[in-house]
Amino acid sequence: MRSVKLFGLAALGSLGAAAPAPSRVSDLTKRSSTCTFTAASQATESASGCSEIVLDNIEVPAGETLDLSDVDDGTTIVFEGTTTFGYKEWSGPLIRFGGKDITIKQNSGAVIDGEGSRWWDGEGTNGGKTKPKFMYAHSLEDSTITGLSIKNTPVQAISVQATNLYLIDITIDNSDGDDNGGHNTDGFDISESTGVYIRGATVKNQDDCIAINSGENIEFSGGTCSGGHGLSIGSVGGRDDNTVKNVTITDSTVTDSANGVRIKTVYDATGSVSQVTYSNIKLSGITDYGIVIEQDYENGSPTGTPTTGVPITDLTIDGVTGTVESDAVEVYILCGDGSCSDWTWEGVDITGGEKSSKCENVPSGASC
């Protein structure tokens, strides 16, 4: 609850007896800047005027969003204890952030628990139960999300549409979904963003660790990804914004996942992928592809027929090393005629699997 509000009423009640001393007014102003809420409705409706918001063991009612997208500029949001959500089949999101110069963090031991097993049915967003998206970091500018511990999201975890946003030391643990029907549990989905910097993330899931669908000036570094579909660009094409530019994915590990490094563009769509660098990526236990780059996606699946409308240019693959399973493909490149160019391919050493016989239009310098 917002205890500072009670203090304010008490102070007003004392006005009839005597005017408060200046120090008391200063005290009141200071106290009223920090607000502690124990209910989602309190936080959503009463956040204005709070320079710091503490979310104390919030239980968000079924079918509602913990909406903190309209807080004052410069607000700090702190998660305390365990944040949970009531069950309902709906599209979500369960949490929404927005604003300028916002800091989002948690106190020691806090966890945001989606209890995703209530929705998991092996189908993700492809059918079955309607599952809520977890967190929208949309319309954030010059902001930081740091140290959050997120567990068992129903489907995709963090959707990013932001400008100059730092996400530091985020843990997303959906490993319970490995044997319980978790699907489409992407870690970070980025679109329509400029300046997104994800550092020190740990993601255990059943889909992309990171998926960049559009945006520029994006960095993912020091990440640890396991159980999912790897470090992905795309699929690019078929959206309102279909440009990916100036992306660096570096100093990260991918283990026990379907893919290591993946770039996919949409069949017969338009757009562009340029100035992308993957460097110092360590792979192990990869089951499908160590590196996969293909221009043939349609309705979420590869067609085997590449098109040229989303060229992949100025790509650097540098120091991608490690092992794949014996029946996995080490490197697969499927490009349209002339639509992959100006690639730099250095220090790639992936072993343990098969060589592909189906690569097409591999650009000069790359190997398949």
UniProtKB/Swiss-Prot annotation:
**EC number of this enzyme:** 3.2.1.15
Native source species: Aspergillus fumigatus (strain ATCC MYA-4609 / CBS 101355 / FGSC A1100 / Af293) (Neosartorya fumigata)
Q: Which residues form the propeptide?
A: 19-31
Q: Where in the cell is it found?
A: Secreted
Q: Which GO terms describe its cellular component?
A: extracellular region
Q: Among its keywords, does the record have Ligase?
A: no
Gene that this sequence comes from = pgaA
Which named protein is this?
Answer: Probable endopolygalacturonase A
User: Some GO term, biological process aspect, for this entry: which one?
Assistant: cell wall organization
Protein task? Involved in maceration and soft-rotting of plant tissue. Hydrolyzes the 1,4-alpha glycosidic bonds of de-esterified pectate in the smooth region of the plant cell wall.
Positions annotated as glycosylated:
N246
